[in-house]
Amino acid sequence: MSNPPLDTEENATTLAITPIPAESLPLVRETVERLRPGVQRDGGDLELVAVQDNIVRLRLKGACVGCAMSAQTLGGVRRELVKVLDNPSVRVLPAP
């Protein structure tokens, strides 16, 4: 099984987009909340900031800020969201 492509601004705009429907927003929130304790155990935290089209924006906090593993963390959230939403076009990007 190959790894999904890295989430970058460029990839987010060039790949096919299947928007996340409004009725799935509670599932997005629940998934982020379910994953937060694992991130918090390492001294970091996640905050859901926005969902637009197929892009989920998360604010990284605590030890996640500037951490070399933050891209891995976002990738893990993406994998979970792709699975629970059954939407391979979901992208998870850091909030500006």
Swiss-Prot record:
<dbReference type="InterPro" id="IPR034904">
    <property type="entry name" value="FSCA_dom_sf"/>
</dbReference>
<dbReference type="GO" id="GO:0005506">
    <property type="term" value="F:iron ion binding"/>
</dbReference>
<dbReference type="GO" id="GO:0016226">
    <property type="term" value="P:iron-sulfur cluster assembly"/>
</dbReference>
<dbReference type="Pfam" id="PF01106">
    <property type="entry name" value="NifU"/>
</dbReference>
<comment type="similarity">
    <text>Belongs to the NifU family.</text>
</comment>
<dbReference type="GO" id="GO:0051536">
    <property type="term" value="F:iron-sulfur cluster binding"/>
</dbReference>
<protein>
    <recommendedName>
        <fullName>Uncharacterized 10.3 kDa protein in vnfA 5'region</fullName>
    </recommendedName>
</protein>
<dbReference type="InterPro" id="IPR001075">
    <property type="entry name" value="NIF_FeS_clus_asmbl_NifU_C"/>
</dbReference>
